[in-house]
Amino acid sequence: MNKVSARPQSTTELRVEAARDQLPIIRAVARTLAHRRGFLLTEIADITRAVDEVGAALIDAATLGSPLRCSFEVSGSAFLLTTAVTSHRGLPRYPGARWRSLEALTDRVLTTDLLGESSGEREVVVAFIKQRRGRR
């Protein structure tokens, strides 16, 4: 009989002003969580760069005064970051270099653009998954 044991899922939520000077805080949380779960240094570097790409995209799209909401979930060998802002513009229809870079750094990128609470507002959500390949 095989015994399967898994670490419990860990979720951390963070809400900051949608401004570029907040990116170091988000990066620090992502790095710390990935490090604590045994991601390799190269994987942590990829996660950190992906956080920058997602954060910059959402900050550019955010409505003035909209917070940037982040949910970090680490379960088993997967690191999932889900981010969201309120926007009047939404995400670009045809993502360019920023999105190609994000896809190269991560294993999966998910985006959605939902109707917001007020007229003309959109709830823009971007998430990515990074799998841990090796062990330190």
Residue ranges with predicted function:
Residues M1-R49:
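Bergerat-fold GHKL ATPase/HATPase_c domain
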Residues M1-E13, A57-R136:
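Conserved beta-strand-loop-beta-strand hairpin that lines the nucleotide-binding pocket
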